[in-house]
Amino acid sequence: MPEILDKVDRRLLEELKNNARENIATLSKKLGIPRTTVHYRIKRLVEEGIIEKFTIKPNYKKLNLGTTAFILIRYDPDSGLTQREVAEQIARIPGVYEVHLVAGEWDLLLKVRASNAEEIGRIVIDKLREIRGVGQTVTMVSFVTVKEEI
């Protein structure tokens, strides 16, 4: 189990979250610690699994994927498939970016991206609803994303 992060580790994570490509020298100046310390701390955070990967944040509008929708799904237990098996099939659908098993009235929560609402509809009608184990669905198209973190 990794130790609790100190203030420097938290600041370093915040800087890397804002720009994973930030170089060691710049991070050293921003944090007020030696470059070797920055390098060591990043390496330790990776080894301890606190940092799983360094990634990018795409501009989905420029990729013609500017429409985001959240879809709630009721699992059909009479399908002969487990809820996890249904979730794994859903995860393979192009345009599905997140699949969550959730508690409450609904069983799964999806985040879907497409070029427009019509394309979201095609994903729901032609792909999702064809999967055995998918019961009722509710689709909510996002007007605007106020905050989205990686």
From Swiss-Prot:
The keyword Transcription regulation applies. SUPFAM superfamilies: Dimeric alpha+beta barrel, Winged helix' DNA-binding domain. SMART domains: HTH_ASNC (SM00344). One of its GO terms (cellular component) is cytosol. The keyword Transcription applies. Keywords: DNA-binding, Transcription, Transcription regulation. Residues 5-66 form the HTH asnC-type domain. GO terms for molecular function: sequence-specific DNA binding. GO terms for biological process: response to amino acid. Residues 24-43 bind DNA. It holds the Pfam family AsnC_trans_reg. This is Uncharacterized HTH-type transcriptional regulator PH1916. It comes from Pyrococcus horikoshii (strain ATCC 700860 / DSM 12428 / JCM 9974 / NBRC 100139 / OT-3).
